[in-house]
Amino acid sequence: MDKHSSFLWTEQFRVQASDTDYRSRGKLSFLLDIMQRAADSAVSSLGLSMESMLKAGMGWMVITLDLNLQRLPSPSELLDVHTWSKGNKGPLWQRDYRIYDAQGVELASARSIWALVDIGKRKILRPSALPIVVEPYVEDSVGSLPDKVIIPPELPLQEAYRYQVRYSGLDNNKHLNNARYADLCCDALALEEWEELELTGLHITYAQEAKYGEEISVMRSSLTEEGVYVRGQGGGRIFFEACLKLRR
């Protein structure tokens, strides 16, 4: 934890070979994973572990994440993840992140919106249901609350592939893990596109939780000024909408 404030959490992660893609660059899902792990550690440091939350039937549900990338990390790099709560607005909590390399250069920054939920009823809980006080950190800010992803209605989408939620994708709530959605988005692009384009970020809104056995039709747009839009849908529901931020 940061020595200057108990409200700012810092945690180090080493990039392993299994965290990288065929180009030896860190996967987008790896960044989402270490951000999630750092956020869990930050809350645990305040006296509320994930285990105790699960016993109480509570959990955190990410709603929207907006990540900007300067570059993807390389194998064996040591990364410092900084994360802090910016407090809540009604039932919604905002959490920011910055990721630095060993030289202190920022690789990525992100804004996110979360909700505290009753795991059994899948209902959003009021902040007062949290048995600890999560004070906001006010010394830094990545930005305002991220907007919900809106795919332009006139933008044509085509099915890239279909994905079925299985054992390897599940989290401890038996839903598809948040970080895995980044893999679903990245898999919508052909290798030729990854050779030609540079990833500069991800903007994603999680609409419905995907359960074991559910099939997701992953739809994508062509390249736009913003990047490639991706939607996961199936069974008459939309699971997520996202924009892979890309440039030539």
Language-model features: where?
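Short, well-ordered turn and helix-capping elements at secondary-structure junctions
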Residues: A17-D19, L69-R71, Y167, H203-Q208
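Hot-dog-fold acyl-thioester-processing enzymes
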Residues: M1-V62, S109-R111, D118-T200
